[in-house]
Amino acid sequence: ESSYLKEFFNQVDKSVQELWGEHKMPLVVVGDAKNIAYYKEVCDRPDNIIATVSNATHLDDGSAQHIVDSVQEAVEEYRASLHQAALGEIDKARGANMLQTDLQEVYRSAFQGAGETLYVRRGYIQSAKIDEKAQTLSVTNDPAAEGVTDDAIGEVIEHVIHNGGKAVFMPQDIMSEDQPISLVTRY
């Protein structure tokens, strides 16, 4: 029986890895403890598994929402660990003098390709006048004014990603109102 199950989970894993290659999403494995153990044994990339849930009930007749509800706690714990790790990275960069929190400096570094990781408080929007030639960003409170970009944060995010960095959105309760953006620089 175990060899059949392992072969079955090996086939499942090949499909999972094919999907993972396209989307790079974290994986939560749901099932009973025995099947989870078999899957982990044959899985090509066990590091992709962020959580396992063996206490979900009625999986045979459960709806998709039932399964989502059963993994929610594990996903929230994973997110919390990512946020704590992000705060650690921010502190480490601050100590190494590789952190910028002033929006003008963040913009300039992002534009120049120096941004490694941009941390942004969810929902943070700021209108500003951007001059790419001078590499300046001037905050304004009138998003409708001529020459004003209503979402300068979106522009910063685009520059960071375009230059090979990444953007991480942080919960509002973790990143404060007075420091809604932080950029860890490459150098």
Give names to the regions the model predicted.
Residues 1-187:
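Terminal alpha-helical anchor/extension segments at protein ends
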